[in-house]
């Protein structure tokens, strides 16, 4: 099952997020994507099914709904960069590919169809 760990600007300071990033652990044999922005550090990891909660969270992040400034656009590029880095350096599961491809498509669609 694909899971995620997350901390963000709403509940931690920058120093706490930096410390969290340094101490993040997961099994090296797991499929994983590390998303780090100014306001959040998230690790998506695992194989298999994607629970609705995980997909919903990443989709909200991709749409800018979880950003300090709602609708912020830079997060879309940051998600793509994290995904592409993981794709180049790790063996990603089919579920992880689908999750991130879907998030990028949804983020793009929301930005093109809303004001």
Where are the predicted features?
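Short glycine-/aliphatic-rich beta-strand segments at the starts of folded cytosolic domains
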Residues: 1-21
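Short amphipathic beta-strand starts and helix->beta connectors
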Residues: 23-31
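Histidine-centered active-site/metal-ligand motif
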Residues: 9, 38, 57
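Short beta-strand
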Residues: 31-37
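Short beta-strand segments
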Residues: 6-8, 35, 78
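Glycine/serine-rich phosphate-binding loop and adjoining beta1-alpha1 elements at the start
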Residues: 45, 52-115
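A generic structural motif
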Residues: 39-46
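Amphipathic alpha-helical segments at domain termini/boundaries
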Residues: 36, 50-52
């Amino acid at each position: 099952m694909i899971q995620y760990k997350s901390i963000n600007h709403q509940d931690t300071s920058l120093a706490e997020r930096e410390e969290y990033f340094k101490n993040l652990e997961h099994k090296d044999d797991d499929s994983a994507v590390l998303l780090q922005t100014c306001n959040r550090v998230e690790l998506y990891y695992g194989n298999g099914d994607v629970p609705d909660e995980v997909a919903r969270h990443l989709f909200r992040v991709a749409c800018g709904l979880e950003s300090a400034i709602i609708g912020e656009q830079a997060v879309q590029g940051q998600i793509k960069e994290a995904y592409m880095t993981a794709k180049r350096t790790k063996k990603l599961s089919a579920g992880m590919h689908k999750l991130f491809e879907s998030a990028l498509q949804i983020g793009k669609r929301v930005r093109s169809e809303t004001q």
